[in-house]
Amino acid sequence: MPRKSKTDAGEGVSPVDQIQAYLEQNKGDHYNFEEERSYVVSSGSLLMDIEMGGGIGPGVIRASGLTEGGKTSCALAFAKNFQKMDNAMVVYFKAEGRLTKEMVKRAGIDQDPLKWREIKSNVYETVINLMRQLVQNNDRNFKYMFIIDSMDSLVPKADLEKGPEEANKVAGGALLSSDFLRKMALGLSTRGHICYMISQVRSNVSINPYQKTDAKV
């Protein structure tokens, strides 16, 4: 008759207990003890909502397309419907100058300070640090929709004082997007927040700082 292991005999620590103990000791490194918050925000278009399963929910949404292709207007349409929920605030990071007061008014955005805030900064660290602070220190249980317009215009603080050639990066916007997702995506989706990242799909990516990259869908 084969000899029973300690686990089979009911002795020792089970894997379930080990995992639970580890999670208890490292609460700051995971979201297992937090209840996921789920909802759907309509685009305002029936056809688009059907294609998207009703709209968008918590997590990171990436909207890419041509310059002047309506990406900002689409984001504002989602923002208007997001504001209809209780304790729902839109934080718009204006990293380039496309958004105007007329666009905000035309989209029907509620500009109450607890519903809408525009942050004019293209510094990557400023954007991600403010988002982290709002998500991690949320005693009033707000739901946030962060709109970054656009990822291509964000610049790391260390690059601001460099010359144009020294600071040049191949596909810099994509690199920042990847770093952002690693740091923020899981926390946003678990805690019920949306980050709407606007960017352009580029062709002719080159290490030559004098060669123009073309927007392309």
Spans of features found by a protein language model:
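Intrinsically disordered, low-complexity linker/loop segments enriched in Gly/Pro
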Residues: 93, 114, 143, 151-152, ...
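Flexible beta-alpha connector loops of hexameric P-loop NTPases
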Residues: 114-124, 159-176, 209-215
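Loop/turn-to-beta-strand initiation segments
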Residues: 88-89, 141-145, 190-197
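Conserved RecA-like ASCE ATPase "motif II neighborhood" in helicase/translocase motors
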Residues: 128-140, 163, 211-215
